[in-house]
Amino acid sequence: MPEITLTVNHKAGLHARPAATFVQTCNRYKSNIRVKHGDKDVNAKSILSVLTLGANQGAVITISAEGEDAEQALSDLTKLIDGNFGEGG
């Protein structure tokens, strides 16, 4: 299963609007997508699950995807996170 490790640089971390944007992006794909921070590994397509990660600014997260569009999903999620969720935060 391909995976990527990224640092969340957005000032709000993976919370509120950034989390919603992240989950919306994940839901565009058929692949099973998981996100891990610390000892928590959750369904990346669930806003409540993503919020429970507590991934603040500077958090290192690992995203894995399994399915026919896994590579594209990981590529787009990398762009989203590296681009501060389109908010410039």
Predicted regions and their residues:
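Intrinsic-disorder/low-complexity, polar/charged segments enriched in Ser/Thr/Lys/Arg/Asp/Glu/Gln
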Residues: 1-5, 60-62
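Hydrophobic alpha-helical segments and their boundary regions
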Residues: 2, 43, 72-73
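Compact, glycine-rich, soluble single-domain proteins
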Residues: 7-48, 52-58
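C-terminal structural segments of small proteins and small subunits
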Residues: 56-89
